[in-house]
Structure formats: C-alpha cells, structure tokens
Amino acid sequence: MRILVKGTGVAGLTAAFELVRTGVTVEVCERNAEPSRGASWYAGGMLAPWCERESAEAAVLTLGQAALDWWDEATPGLVVRHGTLVVAPARDKVELSRFASRTAGYRWVDEGEIAALEPDLAGRFRSGLYFPGEGHLDPRLALKSLHERLCTMGVRFHMGIPLDEEPFDRVVDCTGSAAIGGISDLRGVRGEMLYLATPEVSLSRPVRLLHPRIPLYIVPREPGRFMVGATMIETEDAGAISARSMMEFLNAAYAVHPAFAEAEIIETGTGVRPAYPDNLPDVTQDGRTIFINGAHRHGFLLSPAMARQAAEFVCQTLSQKERDHETSGEWRRA
C-alpha cells in the first residue's frame, strides 16, 4: 500500500512515522520548499498533560500521557523529564488553588522546595505546584530529528512541488491551518511567542506563571535561551507580534526573575493554530483521504495519539463505502 502524507508539521511527521512502522510505503509532500514553519515551529514543546487538563477536556490528559514515551522513542535524547513548576505572585496565590482544583498529578511545594528545584528562583515565590510526571522538548530539534529519521526509514519527501494524489492508495491530510475554509468548523487561533537570551538565569524545566487574565510560561531551550509564550487570540492573522503581547511576555519574564530585564530579545514569532469549536483534535475520513487536524495548542502532546489512530484507519479492512464520511469521535468520548 502506498500512502501520501500532506504536511511537514508535527501532525504530518508523526503520522508518517506511525504509518511507515506498519509496513506501508509512505511519501510526504509539503507545499513550501522548506519544511513547515507554521504553528509547530513556534510551539512551546511542553509535554504537560496534567497542566493542560486545567483548561482542557479530559481527553487531553487521557490521550496525552503517552506522548513523553512516544517522543523519547521517536527522537532519542530530546525529551527532558524534569516536570513542570507552576507559580504565582503572592497577590495571585488564589490562582494556584484554582489551578490545583482543576487537575491532578501535582504536589504542593514551598519556598525551600522551589529553591531546590530551581535555585535561581530562590526566595521569589512562597509556594507552587510541581508536576513531576511532565516533560518538554525543543520543537525545532524534534521536527528536524524526526524528519531525518523518516529519511533513514525510506520515506521520500517532496518539497515545494505539486504532487499527483491519484497513484496513492490513501492520502493523509495534515495541512493544519492551511485547511481552514476547506474543513467544516475549523478555525484559526493565533499564538505569539518570543525568545530571550541571558546568561544570568538558569532553569531546568518549564515555569508557568499564573495570572487572572493571561497565564504565561517560560520554557528553557539551550543554555541561556528561553521561549516565552503564548497568547491565544481568536484570529487567523499571522502578522507580527503585538505590542501588548510583547509587554505581557516581558512583564511575566521579569516577574519570574528580574535578570530577564537585561535579556536580549533574539526572536519573536506568531503561528496560527488550527482548532475545532471544542478545541479538541479529530481524525476523520472522507473517501480515501484521512484528515488529521484541530490540535489547537496541543500539537506535540496529542499528535502521537492522532497519528496512531490514522494508522489504524489505514490498516482497517472495512470497505470504502463503510468508511466514507466517517468521523471517529474518539477525542470527544475520551
């Protein structure tokens, strides 16, 4: 069986990986000449199902828990399993209790325990939540690593050139926000981020700063570099970061550690995340085309589960008529 995967974002590459492991022949096409630099490129890369459960459906936790092991296997050495630290300014301590009431998988930590986890935050926060079972990765390194591994597994990539779908037995469409307008109910949610560089701060894990209006996070990358994100704005505009978002990011970083005030802003970016009305992804099939889309802010967390479901679709022996226009609904039942 010959399968075409459309898209080289996280959904496309994870789908290609799961499919090729079933023994089928996989080819990947990308409309751009270079691998996708859409929402996946600007992602936080937090593999944090318990933290995300605070504001997401139970399916995000249920299906996201396997993501750490999946990424560890697919991209060896890139997953950092140091957990997540959630903190809040003293005036917003009630936000910690609210956050804790909506999820699980954490333990309360006091000022001394926070200092033990993150020495550079010693004396800055009186209490917090520590999620030991979570992790993170650098999305850009993960995408590059997965692309290279797929090449070694015999997957062919077609970049920036039209490809005839007719010779393929199945097509797996993972085109993300590019499919908005072509897939019913799919919308775009803008996310903004920036990168800071400073040798004065060291963090071992993502730090989430709670705020009543806009909670933000700081994710360590290579030594001395940090990704700060991310907004969720109901628009499909992928223009430059707004002044308001920039100020909120910088204020949040300064609240975590004052040394960020002297950090260099080395990059800003925006991406449009594809999302359905309930903010849950779905895997659907129409004829011989399977659609993977709607990951919203959970691309790296939920793409492995979506990819596995797509591979199951391909391997099923149901007749074409039985599969036409079928929607799995697994995401909304979990």
Segments predicted by a language model, with ranges:
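Glycine-rich FAD pyrophosphate-binding loop
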Residues: 20-40
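N-terminal Rossmann-like FAD-binding beta1-loop-alpha1 element of flavoenzymes
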Residues: 2-27
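Helical element adjacent to the flavin cofactor pocket in flavoenzyme catalytic cores
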Residues: 129-166, 170, 174
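C-terminal catalytic lobe of FAD-dependent flavoproteins
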Residues: 263-334
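Dinucleotide-binding Rossmann-like beta1-alpha1 core, especially the glycine-rich loop
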Residues: 44-117
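Short beta-strand to alpha-helix junction loop
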Residues: 55-65, 87-94, 129-145, 240-244, ...
